């Protein structure tokens, strides 16, 4: 919200393509502060990059925003291709990286992203309730220009100018949640010890293993095959199974997976592979999921679960 309210006004128009719940939330936030062209794709389907570029060719957009990793549907957008498209048309590229930063390659400088938003509680395995924004110099200058022109949105606590001024002194405009910041700092120390590259690889190993395992067992995956996420896998339930399975998985097997959002509730489940989850824990979790499906009468072949994660 701070990124959108500070760097836009009602004279601006932004393009927001979406293919899931959290992208739609980005579009809704943008509508509070500026004009929005919402390209609403089917959940789990890849963006039509040709359509996105056709829109940009109209020359009426100042920015394009995406939810980089859409965890509601288990799809990761082709951020690099979209970034190149934005550069060709002189449009700012803004990235919701809440569930991608720390869990997969994100390159703000290479992609010339104007702003990247991230949350602590996802791929960096920090506490919930704290977030960070990275902005480039162009974004800072544009925010200042909007303020000088008198077009700024009246959002006192979301004013980026105040944050930038205090940031020069390594301070915040108001008292921060110090305990959360310290918790996040500790989590980032763990990430530093592991290294970005090693964490990306571990998340990819787990996600690929989950995808291959459940596909071999006859399950269908929601997201398009070319862009499936390495931080979460969305798996459709077999016929006759619903969220009662998740309840049983939690109560009998002490294992939790998340359900679906909105119109997909009761039709699929999602397996996370982000943060500090070890591969061994994922293997055991998959064994328990398979056992629970068998409890519900689903006929599944015998498989060597660990072999999918080697």
Protein language model features and the residues they cover:
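Conserved active-site segment immediately N-terminal to the catalytic lysine
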Residues: 109-121
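Conserved PLP-binding catalytic core of the aspartate aminotransferase-like
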Residues: 220-252
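Active-site C-terminal subdomain of aminotransferase-like
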Residues: 121-212, 216
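Single conserved hydrophobic/aromatic residue that forms the stacking wall/gate
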Residues: 1-8, 12
